Amino acid sequence: LPICLLFSLFSFVYLYVFQRDVLEALHFSLAHGKTTFAPMASALVITLILLLLRWGVNSLLGLKGRVRALAYVPSFLVLCALTDVGRGVYISDYHTPWTWLLPLLVLLFVGIGYWLRGVFRVQLNHEGSLWGLVNSNLAILLGLCLLTVCGGSTNRQFHHELEAEHYLRAGEYDKVLRVGEKSLEASRTLTAYRAVALSRLGKMGDRLFAYPQYYRSDGLFFETRSEERR
């Protein structure tokens, strides 16, 4: 039960707090902007589905004792697939290696796990001390959490772009300008978002050079597909 609660907490916080903008971008791309994204509901529903997936995996493999937490491996793989998103998410022919990699890895895990269950049946039935049981499963869960964080989107500039885009779409132009305002890094896309927000606020002449302008006049416009391929 504690492992279940810890996984639920990690999944919800990771999706709702750290990868919220990535989930929104993925939703916008898949739904073509026709439905409204609900971040909290999405994080809760996904977490619930992942818990059900874990239950199904453990029902199939019967993982016990010190390796019980390994039943969360497919759930963590799904988290990686959902959050390993790059700038190509908005391209009409967007595709990701996770489309074939995720089912392949899950099938491999289930196959190997099913085989190992038969080989180590005696060891699995011997749970040992409670302290050792808890420590072993916590170590597995922590390792899976770290791997998931490393596998998800960690590009700070990309997150800034997505956050600015969210506020721009909502018409909250002041908030667009506060995204990454203390950072000296600024991608061309973020620079263009700031220019649009300043234009809408009628403050471009006053505040344009309050932000880094690494792209000169090109920073006022978004990159075209041909420019991205150079």
Where are the regions that the model predicts?
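Membrane-anchoring hydrophobic segments
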Residues: 1-74
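Aromatic-anchored segments of alpha-helical transmembrane domains
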Residues: 10-17, 73-85, 143-148
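Alpha-helical transmembrane segments of polytopic membrane proteins
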Residues: 30-49, 95-109, 134-136, 162
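Intrinsically disordered, low-complexity, charge-biased linker/tail regions
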Residues: 64, 76-77, 108-113, 213-228
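Membrane-embedded alpha-helical segments of integral membrane proteins
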Residues: 65-125
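Internal/C-terminal transmembrane anchor helices
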Residues: 129-155
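Soluble catalytic regions of membrane-associated enzymes that act on cell-envelope
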Residues: 152-230
